[in-house]
Structure formats: structure tokens, C-alpha cells
Amino acid sequence: MKFTSVLAFFLATLTASATPLYKRQNVTSGGGTVPVIITGGPAVSGSQSNVTTTTLFNSTSTLNITQLYQIATQVNQTLQSESSSGIIIVTNWRSIETLSFFCSIVFNTSKTIVITENFLWGVPILSSSDAEGRGTLVAGRDKVVYSGVFPPYTVPVGVLSGQKNVQWFFDACEPTLIASNSTIRTQYSNFTSAQISSNASSGTNTSSSSSSPLVPIIYEEGYSQSLIQSLSSSIQGLVVVSSGTSHNSTVASWTSVDFPVVYASDGSSGHDGSGIGFISNTSIPQGAISAGYLSPIQAQTLLSIAIHNQVTSSSELQQIFPVSQQ
């Protein structure tokens, strides 16, 4: 079951994204305008006032790294407007985790970025003056506001009170991983570039670090030497979902592979189906990198961003994953 899912994901990510559809719709009434980017999910109702929508995709599957950077380009254009206090990005439920974490890393801004399945859930958040300076936020259907840096729906930072107000649980602050003095912000400011190389859409066979990296996720118990050999010529990085402690690992060492390998813990496999896992440097095979508290999908996203920006050495990657900050 898991191996089939991995192969399906692998094949899906091999497919280049289609040229995005840019469709603008203005829904007006008095007052300020709420900018909304649609990448999937329900359509914006034409009766809703003060909303300007830009439709990039109508995706029902998980957004790939090329699509994420295309979204980033559009978001940058919107955030550069002096009249913009932030933006709402609507996506499908499968992409909530990937998109919210990607935006957390790529956008170094105090302006509010809200990721949601329904733009109506994001409007009160964007309208709140206290939303700024918290990093990317996720608006859930349960009326709770979550941090986009952590696995989805695990770290609440506020709750909708009524239909228009947000009750924040604490004063605005950014998570350590993306704080202004963090390693990512001080040493890897190029991560905030929203541009993807033109090589990503060209027909030339260039280095993956200058195009769209392919970073699949596999489960440790499904590991086999033949699987790695079949993937090694096509992938630029790998995320392994840990099966437990180091003495249970089916792999002794990853030092012989020529791509970075990150081990992550799946907190969603807990008894309640959700949560935050953690894996330390002492719980992984030699040559691998620990994702710390990041979920497998978040580890995949951060590793893809790093490879895209030509950060591939083990020493550099160890600095940007949160386990180094423990």
C-alpha cells in the first residue's frame, strides 16, 4: 500500500506542470480589496465583496515544486504593492501542508499570508492588524488559525471569534526556524528568491540544482537496494520516513549515495492521527540528515528548496533543519 503510494507520487512529480492559467476576477463593493490567489479548492463566489482573485491552477493533487515557485512569483507581485497588507492563497486539502511550509520558508515578510481551502475562512485573518509578523498562517475549517511552519493543524495560534474577529493566543512572533536571526534568514537569504530557473522549462539536460529537483518520499520499511538503484539516476534528494530508533533501521549507511538523504518522523501515525514527531541525529543512519520536528512532507519541501538553490552538502543541510537548533 505504502510502496504503491510512493510510486504514484514519484510518477506524478516526474510530470512537468502545465502552463498555468491566469484568470483575474474582480468582485467589488466599497472598502479595501482582499487579494486571493486560487490554486485549487472551491471557486470564489461572485457575490462576495472586496475580493480580487487570480486563478493560477485548479489543481486537485499535491502541488509540485515548479507550481510552488510559480505561485511564489505571483505572491511576490502582490506583496510588493504598498496597498497590500497580505494575501490569501486558496488550495486543495492535499496541498495545505506543502504550500504553507513553502511560503513560510520562501517569503521573508511581515505581511500576512494565509493558506486555506476556502477564502472565506481567511478573510478575518487577513483583516486583523495583529496577524502580521507571525509567518504564514493556515485557516482551518474548525475556525482555528494555525502556524504554517509546523505540520498542519498541530500548533494553533488563534481562533475566529464570530465571523469577523480573531482572538490571538499570544503576541505576534515568528517561529525559530524562520526568525530574523535564524540560519535560514541570515545565511541562506537566497531561499527567499521566488524565481525558478528557465532551465526548468527547457529541453536541455541541466543540473537539477538549477531546475526543479525531484525529491521522493519512501518508508524505511519499504527500502530495498534495488529501489534505490532504480531511483538514483532520476532523483536529486530523498526523504525517508523513519520506522523508529537507529537499531531498527534497515539501512546501515547512506554515505555511498550521491544525493542528500533526510530522515523524518511521521507524527500523524500516532494514536490520534495527528501530531508532531521528532527524530534526532542519533536515531538515523550514517550519512543521513535529521529533519527534527518537520514532517516528511515538510522535509521534502525544505530539501527541494535547498537543492533548487544549490545547497546540497551534508554540512549545509544540517544547519537549516531544525534539529541543529535544539
Swiss-Prot record:
Q: What induces it?
A: Induced at very late stage of sporulation.
Q: Which domain of life is it from?
A: Eukaryota
Signal peptide interval: 1-18
Q: Where is the Asparaginase/glutaminase domain?
A: 19-324
**Gene Ontology process terms (BP):** ascospore wall assembly
User: Glycosylated at which positions?
Assistant: 26, 50, 58, 64, 76, 108, 181, 190, 199, 205, 248, 281
Keywords of the record? Glycoprotein, Signal, Sporulation
UniProt lists the family membership as follows: To yeast YGP1.
User: What does this gene product do?
Assistant: Serves a protective function during the early stages of spore wall formation, and contributes to spore wall maturation.
Q: What else is known?
A: The program of events of meiosis and spore formation reflects the sequential expression of at least four temporally distinct classes of sporulation-specific genes, SPS100 and SPS101 genes define a distinct class of very late sporulation genes.
Q: What is this protein called?
A: Sporulation-specific wall maturation protein
Name of the gene this protein is made from: SPS100
